[in-house]
């Protein structure tokens, strides 16, 4: 029987600037896509959520991905229970930076904290008008996202669209499950104990 007292979970979103972290948080907390002013960083927010019969108080922390915030951003990592690490499915650079920048930063400042990997802007990956306006764009595929998840040891990989709200709730449900199901975390930790050798073909091989 679930306890009536809610468990507090601190969830911190990280990732390159302009990948849609703030939009995702606004969409999740307000159930609508922001069409007017979008702040650089979303105000900290907490909400009571029931996941699999367990009531949790989910605290959401947004962070700015730009280099100007490199010294301040890690201050938000203290006490984090889970990270939502986001990249844009239409930005190969943000995908590569998950491995090149964000994983090293999280391992340095918050080692051992579980990660949910998220590919944002899913709607634009199949948008013919958007793709025709951006010739040469190489969207990240689902299989490439899953390969990255395995390589960094993230517990889940989820693709979402804040504009259509598809899978936005699933992102944060997954973040909660990572914390309330320690057995899953232990299984993933065992996988991370033996890091893969060689390069990740879709991220680093053949790239500068």
Curated annotation (Swiss-Prot):
GO terms for molecular function: GTP binding; GTPase activity. A motif (Effector region) lies at residues 37-45. GTP binds at residues 15-22, 62-66, 120-123. Changing residue 205 to S: Affects the membrane location. Pfam families: Ras. Changing residue 199 to S: Affects the membrane location. It is a lipid-anchor. The keyword Lipoprotein applies. InterPro entries: P-loop_NTPase (IPR027417), Small_GTP-bd (IPR005225), Small_GTPase (IPR001806), Small_GTPase_Rho (IPR003578). Keywords: Abscisic acid signaling pathway, GTP-binding, Lipoprotein, Membrane, Nucleotide-binding, Palmitate. Its main location: membrane. It comes from the Eukaryota. A lipid is attached at residues 199, 205 (S-palmitoyl cysteine). Although this sequence has a C-terminal -CXXX, it is palmitoylated at Cys-205, rather than prenylated. One of its GO terms (biological process) is negative regulation of abscisic acid-activated signaling pathway. GO terms for cellular component: cytosol; plasma membrane. It is found in: Membrane. Acts as a negative regulator of abscisic acid (ABA) responses. Interacts with ICR1. Binds to SPK1. Belongs to the small GTPase superfamily. Rho family. This is Rac-like GTP-binding protein ARAC8. It comes from Arabidopsis thaliana. The lineage of its organism: Eukaryota, Viridiplantae, Streptophyta, Embryophyta, Tracheophyta.
């Amino acid at each position: 029987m679930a306890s009536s007292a809610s468990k507090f979970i601190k969830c911190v979103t990280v990732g390159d600037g302009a990948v849609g972290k703030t939009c995702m948080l606004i969409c999740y907390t307000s159930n609508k896509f922001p069409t007017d002013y979008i702040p650089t960083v979303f105000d900290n927010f907490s909400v009571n959520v029931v996941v699999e019969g367990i009531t949790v108080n989910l605290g959401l922390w947004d962070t700015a991905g730009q280099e100007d915030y490199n010294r301040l951003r890690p201050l938000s990592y203290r006490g984090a229970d889970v990270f939502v690490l986001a990249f844009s499915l239409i930005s190969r650079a943000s995908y590569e930076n998950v491995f090149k920048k964000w994983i090293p930063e999280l391992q340095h400042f918050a080692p051992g904290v579980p990660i949910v990997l998220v590919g944002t802007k899913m709607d634009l990956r199949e948008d013919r008008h958007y793709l025709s306006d951006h010739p040469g764009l190489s969207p990240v595929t689902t299989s490439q996202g899953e390969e990255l998840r395995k390589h960094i040891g993230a517990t889940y990989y989820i693709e979402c669209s804040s504009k259509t709200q598809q899978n936005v709730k699933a992102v944060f449900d997954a973040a909660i499950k990572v914390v309330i199901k320690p057995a899953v975390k232990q299984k993933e930790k065992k996988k991370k104990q033996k890091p893969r050798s060689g390069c990740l073909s879709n991220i680093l091989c053949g790239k500068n």
